[in-house]
Amino acid sequence: VLCRGEVLGLTQSESRTMRKTVLALQPKNVYDMALALALIRPAAADGGRKAAYFRSGGKGKRQIITDEDAIEYISDSIGCSMDFADKYRRGFSKQIPSVMNEFLFSLKDKRGNIEQADILKELKHSPKYSYCRGHSLSYGQLVWALAYWKARDPQRFWRATTKHCHSSYR
């Protein structure tokens, strides 16, 4: 169902963007579905980043897809703890100059100019909305279960879907 792009009736997956993402990713399990859901959020997809992810097959340069990816990226970049990295992520997300400047000061001590530019380029998407891994996995499980029932018992699936879901495609 998912690999054919049959997303109609699947909560959180009915958009055209999600359909294209599912077709490109060809999810084989809940984790692939969670990745697809995270990839369509503005922070992960901005500036052709989603397309770059698909071109590289997920094996290219490190990309920030979820909030936790940003935390790990920041922690690795300046060698700080995860809680400090989360503070910096939130600072970039909310565009708090004092927190961003504190991070930049730490970054200048640890990295060269080219590395600094690459790190800041990745973090510039932080103010846009992204999923945390927990939300991505939870919704991934939901969509996976719905797709299972859509394939296994379509009549019961559609009866329940039309009764309980308020889809824009109704």
Where are these regions (language model features)?
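Noncatalytic, beta-rich nucleic-acid-contacting surfaces in large DNA/RNA-processing enzymes
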Residues: 1-170
